[in-house]
Amino acid sequence: MFLLFLLFVVSQVGLLVFSPKFKDLILFRWYYQHIYYPLFTDYTRYRWKYWLVPGFYACILIFCVHLFYNKLNDTVNPYLYSLEKAFIPITIAFTSLTGVASVFVKPLGLQAGPQFQPDYIIFHPSAVCQTCKTIKVPRSKHCPICERCIPLHDHHCIWINNCVGYGNYEYFYSFLLSNCLLLTYASLRLLTLFRITAFKKDKFFLSLFLLTTAFSLIAIVFTYYQLKLVNDGMTNNEQDKWYLVQEYMRNGNLVKDMDGVLYYRSMSTDAQTAEPIFYSTNLYDHSKYHLINPAKILSHEEIINLYDRGSFLDNLKERIHLLD
């Protein structure tokens, strides 16, 4: 039975990897059209798929709570301090509540969100959302899964099947931090109990230790990444845009005109004048520009992030709707 299961898993991995590349072949065509494309490419089909990861993580947390209270409580409880006995259920409840809030509290609408000024680098005025056909507010982004534009958009999180944006940052960050606290505490506390011989061969104890350790590491890494973005004064969505600008600079193609407006140099030249062609950093502007004596940008210090308020706390306050 195990070999059949292993064969099934390997075959599915192979089909997932190769079906996009060989989708014109009969062997892979059906799988690509009915499995790969609707699951991984088409946002509108099989929308239940977006609940698989949140459901999986909820099951992991529920299973860990089950192991602790139903399988290990009688043996572990005598070694816990009174403060710990109160801390554990409170932290579990807080993690659960912030998780539910992160899933079901949606970001606010564009008009209710903060109205940022364009920086003329990664956000430009009068840009129109190609899906909503409305003016794009700086720092917003259209989410094809949520099917609307999100103010101060960070990313669509697969762990909560919800966009993280202005209006639910406070719940999302609380959920991340509570996971870090609960899982790290559980992992370290169980580690201290390994000295007791009775626990070393207990399969439930080992299972709980491995699960809490693995997911605490995942939670810590992801939380660190999110808080670093806050410290840098950017969102996950903006980081991708800044990376593109930095890439232009590293390749020596980022320039500014006499007014300080940024452009990037194309590899092609004008067919008539043989002069280099420049494009705006505005991805919605496909016009060709001819610049006179443009200055090359040589350092990231020459590029100012208008949205960085200068400190972690100031950047964080800007995202918290409840503090507005």
UniProtKB/Swiss-Prot annotation:
Catalytic activity: L-cysteinyl-[protein] + hexadecanoyl-CoA = S-hexadecanoyl-L-cysteinyl-[protein] + CoA
Domain of life: Eukaryota
Transmembrane segments: 2-22, 50-70, 85-105, 174-194, 204-224
Pfam families named in the record: DHHC
Mode of membrane association: Multi-pass membrane protein
Record topology, Lumenal segments: 1, 71-84, 195-203
Keyword Transmembrane helix (UniProt): yes
Sorted UniProt keywords: Acyltransferase, Endoplasmic reticulum, Lipoprotein, Membrane, Palmitate, Transferase, Transmembrane, Transmembrane helix
Cellular localization per UniProt: Endoplasmic reticulum membrane
Domain remarks: The DHHC domain is required for palmitoyltransferase activity.
Role description: Palmitoyltransferase that targets several endosomal SNAREs. Palmitoylates the SNAREs at cysteine residues close to the cytoplasmic end of their transmembrane domain. May have a role in the cellular quality control of transmembrane domain-containing proteins.
UniProt-recorded name of the protein: Palmitoyltransferase SWF1
Gene from which this protein is expressed: SWF1
